[in-house]
Design a protein with these regions (language model features):
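Short beta-strand-to-loop junctions in surface cap/lid or active-site-entrance loops
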Residues: 1-7, 189-193
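Hydrophobic/aromatic beta-strand patches that form the interior of the parallel beta-sheet core
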Residues: 12, 42-44, 110, 139, ...
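The feature captures the conserved acid-bearing segment of alpha/beta-hydrolase catalytic domains
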Residues: 131-211
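Active-site machinery of serine-nucleophile hydrolases
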Residues: 17-91, 136-144
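Gly/Ser-rich "nucleophile elbow"/oxyanion-hole loop immediately N-terminal to the catalytic nucleophile
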Residues: 2, 69-109, 114
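Short glycine-enriched nucleophile-adjacent loop
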Residues: 28-29, 116-129
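Short beta-strand element of the alpha/beta-hydrolase
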Residues: 6-17
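Eukaryote-skewed repeat-based solenoidal scaffolds used as protein-protein interaction platforms
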Residues: 96, 105-107, 111, 123, ...
Length: 211
């Protein structure tokens, strides 16, 4: 790739529970290279670090699970924190900036396992697969957690029902009650509309043995 102005698409790949972002990056590079697309596609593989991986006091960090729900980071030394979703927002915003990437038309956000949960939840923050005239595609691979857009749940007898005597089942990230600070800014109704507006691709692998 000689210049970012030549980039036509971007892939943001989200790691799983073990947060091995480098492995995900390498695998995606291998796939793109095999399709002769390495000059057209930009690959980004962010890592959500923990306290013990901080290299600077200003680094934001999460515990081993909070990042996948889009929750706030722990405060850095100056008291600032940020939602994990906001970090992806900043990447998407830059990629959709035509002054920076004039030919970029499509962004794929994909995740595996815990990363799949992240992508699934994050899809409820955008409307109709579009951001600043850039197409956003969501790919959810081997997800184990799902956001429900209303308070009903599918029972073993095939019926839908609101659960009784269970106060937490519909709270974020499993439902739209008691939303995280980031999702609260979007609001319950907008989140629900976003959820139904997007096309999201779901994949399940029978031999999924890694996180």
């Amino acid at each position: 790739m000689d210049s970012v102005s030549e980039v036509k698409g971007a892939i943001i790949t989200i790691h799983g529970h073990t947060r091995n972002a480098d492995d995900y990056f390498d695998k995606m590079v291998s796939v793109i290279s095999g399709e002769n697309l390495k000059d057209d596609v930009l690959i980004i593989s962010p890592k959500f670090i923990t306290l013990y991986e901080q290299s600077k006091e200003t680094d934001w960090y999460w515990n081993t699970t909070s990042w996948k729900w889009g929750l706030q980071s722990y405060s850095s030394f100056n008291g600032n924190n940020i939602s994990a979703f906001e970090l992806i927002d900043s990447l998407v915003s830059k990629l959709a900036n035509k002054d920076l990437f004039p030919q970029l038309t499509d962004i794929l956000l994909t995740g595996h396992s815990s990363g799949a949960a992240f992508v699934h939840m994050y899809s409820s923050t955008k409307f109709d697969n579009i951001y600043n005239n850039t197409n956003i595609h969501f790919s959810v691979v081997n997800n184990q957690y799902f956001l429900h857009p209303d308070s009903t749940r599918l029972l073993s007898n095939g019926s839908l029902s609101v659960l009784e005597n269970c106060e937490v089942y519909n709270k974020w990230p499993y439902g739209l009650d008691d939303l995280s600070p980031y999702m609260e800014r979007i609001g319950e109704e907008n989140s629900r509309n976003n959820f139904f507006s997007n096309k999201v691709d779901y994949f399940i692998a029978e031999l999924d043995t890694d996180s």
